[in-house]
């Protein structure tokens, strides 16, 4: 592998959602059988689709997956070209507030909520770049902690930088953002389970050993920046 996950943060999985239109007759995940579901291919939401369908006794053979990036999926969803949309914040909040979307299922019990920072192995082998990567990861972890304790300021900055409506940014931020956690065995196992789901669905061409794509060299350095998070 030419890349490695070097740090991880965990978000609130209630923001990872299967959305349906407000007037949809669908009441539970099992009702998705025979329906069209929009999702970004290879995304965390795609993984959530696989695991959520499995939990409901279904598979991707029971639904039609429309692989669309969020902006295209939003258009398809609002025009009712698809029956459901699997996505994350701020798109979840945007669809709820602007399109009257209803949450059919959240990521609770299926999504792990992890977001990884990845570095090139060549950069990790370079002393100068290695030091710069460590500095960046520490700054990011501190920024994530700050954003969580300064939610209104973060929501305003996010809205200003991205063009999100402030109420959408606030709704997403209020659910809780990504917070740094330790890149430990539990994280690796959880991500391995997700990789296995992708392999079983043949989205990935074969078995992937996620541990081989991790590098934990910065974990001690990040401990203080993580604060109360393990």
Range-by-range predicted roles:
Residues 126-205:
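Secondary-structure end/capping motifs
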Residues 14, 45-48, 91, 154, ...:
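Hydrophobic alpha-helical segments typical of transmembrane helices
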Residues 1, 56, 98-99, 162, ...:
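Residues at alpha-helix termini
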């Amino acid at each position: 592998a030419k890349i490695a996950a070097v740090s991880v943060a965990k978000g609130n999985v209630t923001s990872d959602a299967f959305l349906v239109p407000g007037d949809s007759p669908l009441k539970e995940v099992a009702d998705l059988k025979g329906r069209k579901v929009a999702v970004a291919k290879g995304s965390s939401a795609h993984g959530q689709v696989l695991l959520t369908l499995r939990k409901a006794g279904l598979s991707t053979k029971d639904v039609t997956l429309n692989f669309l990036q969020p902006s295209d999926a939003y258009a398809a969803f609002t025009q009712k070209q698809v029956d459901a949309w699997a996505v994350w914040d701020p798109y979840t909040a945007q669809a709820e507030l602007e399109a009257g979307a209803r949450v059919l299922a959240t990521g609770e019990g299926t999504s792990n909520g992890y977001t990884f920072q990845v570095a090139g192995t060549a950069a990790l082998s370079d002393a100068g770049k290695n030091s710069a990567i460590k500095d960046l990861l520490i700054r990011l972890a501190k920024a994530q902690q700050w954003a969580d304790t300064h939610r209104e300021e973060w929501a305003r900055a996010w809205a200003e930088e991205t063009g999100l409506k402030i109420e959408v940014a606030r709704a997403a931020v209020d659910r809780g953002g990504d917070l740094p956690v330790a890149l430990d065995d539990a994280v690796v196992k959880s991500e391995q389970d997700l990789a296995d789901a992708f392999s079983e669905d043949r989205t990935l061409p074969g078995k992937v050993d996620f541990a081989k794509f991790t590098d934990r060299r910065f974990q001690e350095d990040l401990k203080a920046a993580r604060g109360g998070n393990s």
